[in-house]
């Protein structure tokens, strides 16, 4: 069972990730061990549990770098993660950010799937209110046919961009996020071959049963995932203070569905890997700066 996704902000060295067998961490990842790990944290004891590890790739474009070079590094990162035994690679959806290349997760997955063999690939995530659930079902149904048993579909309701891009370029209306629960159910119906619309089927997509993961950083996502009986991926890489509350609620209120009889939790955390502590600290500082640049400066090179 998967325990967590690591939000790895890539360094210029494409293979700057740690071996799953030796990773030490002080954040909870294993869903079945969360309670015990939380107790250790409160007692001040170090946590060194093993977990299935994954990577969330923003596909950063560094200063002086081209989008093509960023894509090439993403391919190398996925290949190295596969060699090291990581469970999956997920790709984000952001728009109008000059330092983030990942605007179309499905296209990236299609490309990187052809360059890898086993590692699972998915979206972390598709911002569903930006899209038609039907089109997303077709896209990820296509990916599942190309790479069977390797595709994940993480969905969120955030815009993934600024308000100007949201309203004018993406043409997303102000109330689209309010339809997120219904959009998730509609999307799932297409993938299960049980379309809500008579005579309409996702081809490809129907009966592929691509697993849907609800992404969130608040109680809203936890509540929705529990109600629908879907896996839950919590964004503790930017909202760590809510991790325990959200995952505990999700597990306690989980309603089994046809596909998932038990709750399934993924926790996103920030990890910086390097050969020495000093190098890791320096890389961490660069990561913090890049995050400010991407989100506060809309990806401009500040």
Set out the residue ranges of the language-model regions.
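An alpha-helical appendage that flanks or caps ligand/catalytic pockets
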Residues: 38-49, 167, 173-202, 241-302
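Intrinsic low-complexity, disordered N-terminal segments enriched in polar/charged/small residues
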Residues: 3-7, 27
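N-terminal beta1-alpha1-beta2 module of alpha/beta enzyme domains
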Residues: 37-121
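Flexible, glycine-rich active-site loops centered on histidine and acidic residues
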Residues: 49-67, 129-192, 232, 240
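Acidic (Asp/Glu)-rich catalytic clusters
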Residues: 48, 109-117, 144-150, 226, ...
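Hydrophobic faces of well-ordered beta-strands that scaffold small-molecule active sites
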Residues: 53-57, 89-91, 121-123, 151-155, ...
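A conserved active-site cap/scaffold subdomain adjacent to cofactor or substrate pockets
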Residues: 226-234, 238
């Amino acid at each position: 069972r998967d325990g967590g996704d690591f939000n790895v902000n890539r360094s210029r060295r494409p293979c700057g990730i740690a071996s799953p067998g030796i990773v030490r961490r002080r954040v909870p990842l294993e869903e079945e061990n969360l309670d015990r790990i939380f107790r250790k944290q409160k007692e001040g004891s170090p946590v060194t549990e093993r977990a299935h590890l994954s990577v969330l790739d923003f596909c950063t474009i560094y200063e002086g770098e081209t989008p093509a070079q960023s894509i090439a590094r993403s391919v190398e990162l996925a290949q190295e993660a596969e060699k090291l035994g990581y469970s999956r690679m997920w790709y984000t959806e952001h728009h109008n950010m000059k330092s983030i290349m990942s605007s179309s997760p499905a296209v990236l997955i299609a490309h990187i799937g052809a360059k890898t063999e086993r590692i699972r690939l998915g979206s972390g995530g598709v911002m569903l209110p930006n899209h038609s659930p039907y089109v997303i079902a077709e896209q990820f149904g296509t990916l599942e046919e190309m790479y069977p048993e390797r595709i994940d579909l993480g969905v969120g309701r955030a815009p993934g961009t600024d308000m100007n891009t949201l309203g004018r370029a993406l043409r997303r209306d102000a109330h689209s996020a309010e339809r997120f629960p219904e959009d998730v159910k509609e999307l799932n119906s297409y993938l299960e071959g049980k379309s809500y619309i008579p005579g309409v089927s996702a081809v490809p997509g129907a009966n592929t049963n691509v697993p849907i993961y609800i992404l969130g950083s608040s109680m809203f996502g936890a509540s929705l995932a529990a109600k629908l009986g879907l896996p839950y991926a919590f964004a503790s890489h930017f909202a760590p203070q809510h991790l325990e509350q959200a995952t505990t609620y999700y597990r306690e209120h989980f309603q089994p569905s046809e596909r998932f009889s038990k709750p399934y939790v993924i926790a996103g955390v920030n990890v910086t890997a390097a050969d020495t502590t000093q190098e890791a600290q320096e890389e961490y500082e660069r990561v913090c700066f890049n995050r400010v640049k991407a989100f506060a400066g809309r990806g401009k090179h500040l």
